[in-house]
């Protein structure tokens, strides 16, 4: 039984500037009593205000999922298809450029570019050539756009296909126009969970190596946690510890890039493969549990990773807005389209307008502002004029 005095002592220590450790974080993550969760929420909200202030950011961006053809079979994924399967798609450059032009006309500053692991995606017999050509075509057409592109899993796939090092792949993509990497494919950085959740995916050590290498070559990354499936509170805490260690290493090593944000990705199982859905026994995320994890993430990471974002796609805009009182200071992006989570049965929608995001932030009593991918404020007049 977790008592109020224990929780209060942990929270007081964090608010006094002492780093939260995995054991204490596990205690907080096990809190089920509403009053205990309210204590944790209050501390996370206080720390958020102290660390990043009371303004809330958003980014005007567009998702570009260029293919769902994938060689892997992750047990939580309803997005992937075999090449000859109904619903499979592989968008050519002309369609991506058309989508990009529409996004730029709507004021976008970022494209988020990710896809399945398609062994046929090659140019001149090489995977890297395909990804470089894809990146360069978008960057040449829209030089002002930041390309937030290719997860560590995609980097590992390219390196394996072509017999290259991670550094070689990352350097080539950076030269072609990639500006940062999404820190997806992390799921939970515990290989006992990964063996059930995504047995074909890269392991935890490889994910961390690719993130570190990206920082070393000057590519910022995000960080994520897929929560609410098979993982335990202890595994959640250890995941946060590994993210913190990555950022601490980047700071200590004075690498030219760092982790820019933490995003919680609650599991959506409604249309996910049946075996995992049956084990989890829940189709939609539990908002209360997701809010608790976000609060503990703020307490754990806030001094090192200051920006925290909920997923309105997974939680709905109302749920994501609640997260602004649980340690989050960003409401994410407009997206304009979304396939991966919506195909799993998420009910949060696939796009938000600037007006919707700003209204949600204002309703939470905060001041909205537009940012770029690296959390720099955007001069709105300049964006719309350009």
Swiss-Prot record:
Organism placement in taxonomy: Bacteria, Bacillati, Cyanobacteriota, Cyanophyceae, Synechococcales
PROSITE patterns noted in UniProt: RADICAL_SAM
Start and end residues of each Radical SAM core domain: 56-303
Cofactor binding notes: Binds 1 [4Fe-4S] cluster. The cluster is coordinated with 3 cysteines and an exchangeable S-adenosyl-L-methionine.
Pfam families the UniProt entry points to: CofH_C (PF19288), Radical_SAM (PF04055)
Subunit structure: Consists of two subunits, CofG and CofH.
Organism (species): Synechococcus elongatus (strain ATCC 33912 / PCC 7942 / FACHB-805)
EC number: 2.5.1.147
GO molecular function: 4 iron, 4 sulfur cluster binding; 5-amino-6-(D-ribitylamino)uracil--L-tyrosine 4-hydroxyphenyl transferase activity; 7,8-didemethyl-8-hydroxy-5-deazariboflavin synthase activity; iron ion binding
Reaction catalysed by this enzyme: 5-amino-6-(D-ribitylamino)uracil + L-tyrosine + S-adenosyl-L-methionine = 5-amino-5-(4-hydroxybenzyl)-6-(D-ribitylimino)-5,6-dihydrouracil + 2-iminoacetate + 5'-deoxyadenosine + L-methionine + H(+)
Name of the protein this chain belongs to: 5-amino-6-(D-ribitylamino)uracil--L-tyrosine 4-hydroxyphenyl transferase
Entry keywords, A to Z: 4Fe-4S, Iron, Iron-sulfur, Metal-binding, S-adenosyl-L-methionine, Transferase
Purpose of the protein: Catalyzes the radical-mediated synthesis of 5-amino-5-(4-hydroxybenzyl)-6-(D-ribitylimino)-5,6-dihydrouracil from 5-amino-6-(D-ribitylamino)uracil and L-tyrosine.
Family designation: Belongs to the radical SAM superfamily. CofH family.
Metabolic or biological pathway, per its Swiss-Prot or TrEMBL entry: Cofactor biosynthesis; coenzyme F0 biosynthesis
């Amino acid at each position: 039984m977790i008592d109020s005095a224990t929780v209060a002592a942990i929270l007081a220590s964090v608010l006094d500037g002492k780093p939260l450790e995995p054991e204490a974080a596990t205690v907080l993550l096990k809190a089920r009593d509403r009053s205990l969760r309210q204590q944790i929420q209050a501390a996370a909200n206080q720390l958020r205000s102290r660390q990043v202030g009371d303004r809330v950011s958003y980014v005007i961006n567009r998702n570009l999922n260029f293919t769902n053809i994938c060689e892997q079979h992750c047990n939580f994924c309803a997005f992937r298809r075999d090449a000859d399967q109904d619903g499979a798609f592989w968008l050519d450059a002309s369609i991506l450029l058309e989508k990009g032009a529409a996004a730029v006309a709507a004021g976008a500053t970022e494209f988020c570019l990710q896809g399945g692991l398609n062994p046929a995606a090659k140019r001149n017999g090489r995977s890297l050539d395909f990804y470089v050509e894809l990146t360069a075509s978008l960057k040449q057409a829209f030089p002002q756009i930041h390309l937030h592109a290719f997860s560590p899993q995609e980097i590992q796939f390219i390196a394996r296909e072509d017999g290259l090092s991670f550094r070689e792949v990352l350097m080539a993509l950076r030269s072609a126009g990639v500006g940062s990497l999404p820190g997806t494919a992390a799921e939970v950085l515990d290989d006992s969970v990964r063996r059930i959740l995504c047995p074909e995916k890269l392991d935890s050590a490889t994910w961390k190596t690719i993130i570190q290498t990206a920082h070393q070559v000057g590519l910022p990354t995000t960080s994520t946690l897929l929560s609410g499936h098979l993982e335990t509170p202890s595994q959640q805490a250890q995941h946060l510890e590994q993210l913190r260690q990555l950022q601490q290493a980047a700071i200590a090593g004075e690498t030219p890039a760092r982790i820019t944000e933490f995003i919680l990705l609650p599991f959506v199982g409604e249309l996910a493969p049946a075996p995992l859905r049956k084990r989890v026994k829940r189709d939609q995320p539990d908002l209360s549990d997701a809010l608790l994890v976000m609060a503990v993430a703020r307490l754990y990471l806030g001094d090192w990773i200051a920006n925290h974002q909920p997923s309105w796609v997974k939680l709905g805009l109302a749920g994501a807005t609640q997260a602004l009182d649980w340690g989050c200071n960003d409401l994410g992006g407009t997206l304009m389209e979304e396939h991966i989570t919506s195909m799993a049965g998420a009910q949060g929608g696939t796009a938000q307008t600037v007006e919707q995001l700003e209204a949600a932030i204002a309703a939470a009593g905060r001041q909205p502002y537009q940012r770029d991918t690296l959390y720099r404020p955007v001069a709105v007049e300049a964006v719309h004029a350009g």
